């Protein structure tokens, strides 16, 4: 389960399992490491993997990606849930970058096993939320590229029933190999040069160049 800090990943796990894992507030995540939560759903043994949020106040997105990639190197998944707050009135550039990074992490071959789950439907009126969902579905820099390759968009209303329905969606699927797993394990690539790592590195390099240019301009002004 991936997504930005405060999207509701841990709350979702609590809804499914009936546990009471600590939940952070919107600006600070309680999940600082990979956390596996095991439970039974009917006769099936299920493992939900809680991950630190992108946009965390204490970790960079590159650090979060490194933690996730390290865990994925030895794990085959049945599916991936990416959570997004429908209450967000706009999508910032860093968040759009993370959508692109997430797409590259998964690759396009197994996106039928990816669910984009929108949360916080109780925090905004339905008409506004429905309009935002349509924007997320149709935006070329949002989720449209993944949906075009058979990813699914689902709603989570914060209830245990809906959370369990979302988990059940994945229980009929086989395990898969993600693009980043293939690149790290089979192709022996280092994380920064994988397709997912390159998305984050490109933005970091551009930020660094802007900082250097700004520093040079300030130095000229001081002289």
Where are these regions (language model features)?
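Core residues of folded domains in eukaryotic genome-function proteins
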Residues: 33-35, 44-47, 76-79, 110-113, ...
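Amphipathic alpha-helical interface elements that mediate macromolecular binding in regulatory proteins
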Residues: 10-14, 35, 46-49, 62-70, ...
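Conserved C-terminal guanine-recognition region of P-loop GTPase G domains, centered on the G4
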Residues: 69-146
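Short acidic, Gly/Ser-rich segments with clustered Asp/Glu that frequently serve as metal-coordination loops
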Residues: 52-59
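C-terminal non-catalytic interaction/localization modules
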Residues: 1-29, 59, 63, 109-112, ...
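Switch I (effector-binding) loop of TRAFAC-class P-loop GTPase G-domains
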Residues: 17-46, 56
């Amino acid at each position: 389960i991936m997504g930005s800090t405060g999207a509701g990943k841990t709350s979702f796990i609590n809804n499914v399992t009936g546990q009471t894992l600590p939940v952070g507030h919107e600006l600070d995540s309680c999940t600082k490491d990979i956390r596996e939560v095991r439970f039974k759903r009917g006769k099936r043994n299920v493992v939900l993997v809680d991950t630190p949020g992108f946009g965390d106040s204490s970790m960079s997105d590159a650090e979060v990606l490194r933690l996730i990639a390290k865990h994925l190197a030895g794990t085959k998944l049945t599916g991936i849930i990416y959570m997004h707050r429908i209450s967000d009135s706009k999508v910032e550039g860093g968040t759009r970058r993370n959508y692109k990074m997430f797409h590259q992490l998964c690759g396009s071959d197994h996106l039928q096993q990816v669910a984009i789950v929108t949360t916080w439907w109780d925090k905004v009126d339905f008409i506004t939320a429905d309009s935002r969902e349509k924007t997320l579905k149709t935006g070329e820099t949002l989720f449209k590229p993944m949906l075009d390759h058979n990813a699914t968009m689902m709603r989570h209303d914060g209830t245990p029933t809906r959370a369990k329905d979302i988990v059940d969606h994945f229980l009929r699927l086989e395990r898969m190999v993600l693009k980043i797993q293939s690149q790290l394990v089979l192709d022996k690539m280092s994380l920064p040069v994988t397709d997912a790592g390159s998305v984050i590195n490109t933005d970091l390099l551009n930020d660094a160049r802007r900082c250097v240019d700004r520093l040079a301009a300030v130095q000229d002004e001081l002289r």
